């Protein structure tokens, strides 16, 4: 007889219970054991944790725009209206160098250039006129940046002095290039076409648009824009300067080549000043970011002088011109305090002899490295005394 406490079960139920895994499951000593996860669920759980951890790290590492108050060059300076006492002596010396190098367009003799111009091949005239058109427009773009952005952002008096003088020199450069176009090009329609190069020439427009984008970029830091305009004056101009020095090597266009010496020296100084301002920054762009800006400018300049306006028109080697632009970019990277990108040698031996200070011009009475008398001397050097030994 069955006990009243025993569960009633059919034979089928007993057989099913006998086959079930639950019958073999032992719960002895398992009271505090946590439930186990399948391997798939374990992997999924780990992956989820890793994703959330990575996203949290990315958020914490997200680049934040440095505060203006953290940059001595940019923070509010109530003493910016007075020059003395000098606080940044290295910046002040750059300003005095620029001041000592002042020149005007009227000092360049173009009388011999007309005869040379008429003797040039059509391809050579085409190349020179288009390079001059680019130069005439680009100096205005550099000034736009100085007036609209840099001069208003930088609060250090010494730097403001330099920027003010740079604006004056860029105006003289633009006047010089416009004067060259006006002297060489007699056809009024062609002159108008060249003076409006930003709108009429796609190759010039591409370079101009790149620079103008940096002027209008409200998100880019001052440091990024300093690098960009160092690239404009150091890389965008480099190939065109070299092409005109190539004409000098051939003994052509004395007025053009002498003005090119003066302007290339000025632009070299402007580029050096940009690097100096970069070094004074507390929060600099990363090397990767600087590399990105420089390589973009190199690509655009290489395309300009090897495809859009190939230097082969004046007898230069396009491959070597590409290498020269890379060489200039490497030099700029070093000046900014970073490693070289391309690691190439200077392929143009004639450019080795052209320093930023300039060399005596064979055709000119004046020399390209001249400076205004007394500008770089100390006040004690010009004092009058009676203590000389006779």
From Swiss-Prot:
PTM annotation: Phosphorylation on Ser-20 relieves the inhibitory effect on Wnt signaling. Phosphorylated on Thr-33 by CDK1 and CDK2; predominantly in G2 and M phase.
Pfam families for the chain: Ribonuc_red_sm
EC number: 1.17.4.1
Cofactor names: Fe cation
Membrane-traversing stretches: none
PROSITE patterns attached to this UniProt entry: RIBORED_SMALL (PS00368)
GO terms under biological process: 2'-deoxyribonucleotide biosynthetic process; blastocyst development; deoxyribonucleotide biosynthetic process; deoxyribonucleotide metabolic process; positive regulation of cell population proliferation; positive regulation of G1/S transition of mitotic cell cycle; protein heterotetramerization; pyrimidine nucleobase metabolic process
Domain of life, per lineage: Eukaryota
Locus of motif Cy: 49-51
Subcellular location: Cytoplasm; Nucleus
Keyword presence, Oxidoreductase: yes
Residue numbers carrying Phosphoserine: 20
GO molecular function terms attached to this record: ferric iron binding; identical protein binding; protein homodimerization activity; ribonucleoside-diphosphate reductase activity, thioredoxin disulfide as acceptor
One cellular component (GO) term of this entry: nuclear envelope
Keywords recorded for this protein, A-Z: Cytoplasm, Deoxyribonucleotide synthesis, Iron, Metal-binding, Nucleus, Oxidoreductase, Phosphoprotein, Ubl conjugation
Modified-residue entries (Phosphothreonine), positions: 33
Residues reported in the UniProt entry to bind Fe cation 1: 139, 170, 173, 267
Binding site for Fe cation 2: 170, 233, 267, 270
InterPro entries: Ferritin-like_SF (IPR009078), RNR-like (IPR012348), RNR_small (IPR033909), RNR_small_AS (IPR030475), RNR_small_fam (IPR000358)
EC class of the enzyme, as a word: oxidoreductase
SUPFAM superfamilies: Ferritin-like (SSF47240)
Catalytic activity: a 2'-deoxyribonucleoside 5'-diphosphate + [thioredoxin]-disulfide + H2O = a ribonucleoside 5'-diphosphate + [thioredoxin]-dithiol
Function: Provides the precursors necessary for DNA synthesis. Catalyzes the biosynthesis of deoxyribonucleotides from the corresponding ribonucleotides. Inhibits Wnt signaling.
Other comments on record: Two distinct regulatory sites have been defined: the specificity site, which controls substrate specificity, and the activity site which regulates overall catalytic activity. A substrate-binding catalytic site, located on M1, is formed only in the presence of the second subunit M2.
Family, similarity comment: Belongs to the ribonucleoside diphosphate reductase small chain family.
Protein name listed in UniProt: Ribonucleoside-diphosphate reductase subunit M2
